[in-house]
Amino acid sequence: MKHNRQMPDESLENIKVLLNPKLGKPVKSLTSAQSKACYHTLISNKNLNKTSDEYEKLLANYILLCDEKYLCKTVIPDSRFWAILCDNCQKLRSETLVANLIRIFNVALKCQDSNKNEVIVSICHISRENSQLIGILLQLLSQRPIHIPLFTDTILCITLFLKCSLTLCETSLSHAVEFVPRILILLFQYNFPASMSELLYIEDLQPLILEEFVPLKQRLINFLSSVSIDDYSCSLKADLLTAIKDNSVFQKGLEMEMGDLPSINLLNAYDTFTFLNSPNGSFKRLYTEQLLFGENDFPLYEAIFKLSDQFRRLFNLSGKKENQYSDSERDLKLQIATAVLNRQTCFYKTLELFLRFWIESLAKSQSDLVSLLNLAIITLKYVCLSSSDLEAAIQTKSLLKTQVVALDSMRYKFARTLQLDSIKKEQYRTWSSSIASFDTMLSGQVRDYVRHQRLLQLQKGTWVYAENPLNPEAGTPKVYFLIVSDNHANLLAREFETQTNDLPYLFDNKILTSPGSEALANGRTKVVVLKHITSFKSIELTTPSRRTSSNVYIKLDEANVYTGVELKDRNDRTVLKFYLDTEEGRYIWLDGLKLISPFQHEDISEDTKEQIDTLFDLRKNVQMINLNVRQDIIVPPPEPSDEDEDEEFYNLETLKKVTQNFYFD
């Protein structure tokens, strides 16, 4: 009996020599026989961990030194091993536990034996039976200060764990439908997304998160979307029904809307479950009010299921990105990664936005639901991928906060504006190859129209200063009357001492005035040939600011703004110099002369450019209304041999016809 009691102790001493470098030679990997002996000894002496601090160290060293095949074939599939590791994990240093799990996950992924599926299933079982192991890893990432080597290994370890679950998606669907949702829910429960969002901005951690973890999570999400909840037996369905029953408002909503839970995919179920288990107080209040007082109940579950599918498509990293939302590929990845990592937060906020849109738009039908779904997705796309605030948010490391605030503050009217812009961009993109020639033609037409508009104004004539009105030595500055000739070839100017009561007029290419005002005129009409003007020089002149008198309640700064204009010929000689005293005068005369000039002048004012752009968009939008946007109903052009067939596609001639009999107001 004494000999039998000492055997475990003697065996334990033997493995100390193999596993503890302090007592023997430098540590080497164990052989298969040594691995077997050590494992049996550790299992037999598992209760020693309650009385000795050496046991967990031996266990940790054993995991690192165990023969790879034995570890894969015997140790990992053994539930006793996981129970022992779970009992001792709190005593191990964080670095040691992470290193042990990395070894286990790597060995399992590399396993080529027929029992690989059993090995992977055993690892995924810890999400249910020994979830504190993964919980410790997730909690490590919320600790501060940030220890880069430990955090890098921890993220790698979690990534390997997800890779194990992804392997099940290929080898055992029945197990995958059970464990993949459970693992993602485990990450959600430990607030893992928030921790990763903060670490996303750490330069040393960013590549691992962006290139490894985020795409991996998205692949798991894609898997969930491909499997119906009724195809396999899984606990998620029961958990979802329990979550619905635990909240009377949401249970009533399901009964009124659908009666029973329909056949949905696992991703729909996962998104619904996490939503019901989120802090959704504001949504619940708004939804309850809508059920009580709204005329048309919000179809909550149909909205969740549809939004779930659209959300996945929008942030699908594995798919082709048709649009680039940022000039920087890195910034784009950060934006998508933030949305993928914080899927539940963004999903919840978008669903709340969906509900607000339903109430504000007085929606009531299925077509309204589809329309608002598109509106919500376009809004989400703008907020998460293309908003002008995102660049600053990336710099301040507050991308998620910026996205959440933007969704909370989004207004229905502005969202509809975003939707209109999106529709126009999609239509332009679809027809870009066919419409390029039309754009060139339309641009010329719009510029000609604005040119003609200015010409009509220039032919009415105007008073301008002939001398600098801000020159105190000039006294009362003389003035010019300017007008463009009937043949549009000349700019005519005549100097006057001051403005006349009667507006001068043009006759035979000369500026004339009434006999009573002729005494105020100086000299003859000056003719400036427009084709001789090669450049327009302008400078803004401002009087010193002066305040209103002190006996008024509101004091305003007053300042007069003038524009000095010089018309120069090819030799840089000034052929005419005058001063405009209003913004309107600058807008009409300076831009107008540039537009009617035979030379091309691009330096027109922003107001005129805006007018041209607005008119161009107006004309283009009118003709785009009649064009289909769906690719499947765009008839391709016929082959060159089909000359006798009618043209059933939109080409330049068709686009020209669209704008016939169209006039600007």
Curated annotation (Swiss-Prot):
Gene inactivation effect: Leads to hyper-resistance to cell wall stress agents such as calcofluor white and Congo red.
- Please give the organism: Saccharomyces cerevisiae (strain ATCC 204508 / S288c) (Baker's yeast)
Quote the function comment for this protein: Forms a transiant heterodimeric complex with DCK1, that acts as a guanine nucleotide exchange factor (GEF) for the small GTPase RHO5. DCK1, LMO1 and RHO5 relocate to mitochondria upon oxidative stress and trigger cell death. The DCK1/LMO1/RHO5 signaling module mediates mitochondrial turnover under nitrogen starvation conditions via mitophagy. The DCK1/LMO1/RHO5 signaling module also plays a role in cell wall integrity signaling.
Write out the annotated subcellular location: Cytoplasm; Mitochondrion
Could you list this entry's UniProt keywords, alphabetically sorted.
Answer: Cytoplasm, Mitochondrion
Name the domain of life this protein comes from: Eukaryota
Could you state one GO cellular component term attached to this entry?
plasma membrane
Q: What is this protein called?
A: ELMO family protein LMO1
**Note from the entry:** Present with 486 molecules/cell in log phase SD medium.
Task: Check the record and name the InterPro entries matching this protein.
Answer: PH_domain
Offer one Pfam family short name for this entry: PH_12
On whether Ion transport is a keyword of this UniProt record, the answer is no
Q: Name one GO biological process term.
A: actin filament organization
Task: Report quaternary structure and partners.
Answer: Forms an active heterodimer with DCK1.
